[in-house]
Amino acid sequence: MFDKGRSKEDVFRDLNVFHNMDMKYSSGRILGSMCTKPDPVGLEAYKMFIETNLGDPGLFKGTALMEQEVINSLGNLLHLKNPCGHIVTGGTEANIMAMCVAKYLYEEENEGTPELILPKSAHFSFKKVLSMLSVKPVYVPLNNEYKIDVTKLPDLITDNTMAMVGIAGTTELGLVDDIPEISKIAKSYGVYLHVDAALGGFIIPFLNYKNNNQLNFDFKCKGVSSITIDPHKMGLAPVPSGGIIFRKKKYLEKLSIKTPYLTKDKQTTIVGTRTGASTAATWTLLNYHGMEGYKKIVEKVINLTTYTYNKLNKNKHVTIIHKPELNIISFKVDNIDVDTLQKQLQAYGWIVSLAEYPHVIRLVLMPHIKKEHIDEFLVDLDIIIQKNR
């Protein structure tokens, strides 16, 4: 900080330098992110509510009402009447909140070290949970499809089992665990089941909409206790906009603490100060697009994913790990180390990410990516393959 302030022109000159260092979603070259270019309609709403703080909802009654309407809409999307929850910073916070609730419920009747049953495919946010909440991990094996091997679950449940986690749209491969079967096991053993649908939550319902071949992952599964769903992924809301939905009000109330100096006497979130702009943007987009609008957005992305998969699948040097269920394609190339391939693609201006298990290249087909971007990517990939032969 300077002793004296600088001119606005001088400050913004530097801002432009920083801004030009950033990748832009509109370039179509960000192929490894689950976030995307925000919908301009949502951005307009975001700016309109930029001053709001849902940490003090009595001051911002309209914004607080919008949050409840958003939670009701998301609950309806996930087949739950009378949902409880919040719009939060993202999937990590939502997952932590769910695990906090699970631990508090566990501690009502247990004194042993709590155990969390989760797959190797779980998002890294659960590693934060293990440390923050002093929880012991119990990893359930994956089957040949890289999904939870549900046959192994009953043997892993003990008196110390705090919760189980299932994934609807794994971060690395975009796969959906057998939530209906996991739900039956959770309900049978009385275990809290959290579904991380940060990615799939804004995809699967619109794939299912007016479609008889439905993926079942939500509160229709009676053993599901809570679901993470992120509007700032396929919902096109600006970052940060995550969501956590609980089946029962008593679950959310487990997070309640007194806030005597604010306009409301309690909070049920981890974060205190909480922007209302994300809620306003999400409310706007849910109303603006509706089910039909989001169905079109999702179909466009899935069609592009299928197109990309088919093109890659025809390349004899490329091995695709799993036929995509959502909008993620993971692959490797013969005779090229995965880390080397990532760096070589980056040299051509393509930002792809790596999956850890299995260790492969990971493409995420989000709404900012167009067919012409994929065609350009495939040309560059082929050039790299030929150079490495």
From Swiss-Prot:
Residues spanning the membrane: none
Catalysis: reaction(s): L-tyrosine + H(+) = tyramine + CO2; L-aspartate + H(+) = beta-alanine + CO2
GO molecular function, one term: tyrosine decarboxylase activity
Co-factor requirement: pyridoxal 5'-phosphate
InterPro entries noted in UniProt: GrpII_AminoAcid_Decarb, MfnA, PyrdxlP-dep_de-COase, PyrdxlP-dep_Trfase, PyrdxlP-dep_Trfase_major, PyrdxlP-dep_Trfase_small
Enzyme Commission number(s) of this protein: 4.1.1.11, 4.1.1.25
Keyword Lyase assigned: yes
Protein's pathway: Cofactor biosynthesis; methanofuran biosynthesis; Cofactor biosynthesis; coenzyme A biosynthesis
Disulfide bond residue pairs: none
UniProt xrefs under PANTHER family: PTHR42735, SPHINGOSINE-1-PHOSPHATE LYASE 1
Role, per record: Catalyzes the decarboxylation of L-tyrosine to produce tyramine for methanofuran biosynthesis. Can also catalyze the decarboxylation of L-aspartate to produce beta-alanine for coenzyme A (CoA) biosynthesis.
Family indicated by similarity: Belongs to the group II decarboxylase family. MfnA subfamily.
Protein name listed in UniProt: Probable L-tyrosine/L-aspartate decarboxylase
Organism: Methanosphaera stadtmanae (strain ATCC 43021 / DSM 3091 / JCM 11832 / MCB-3)
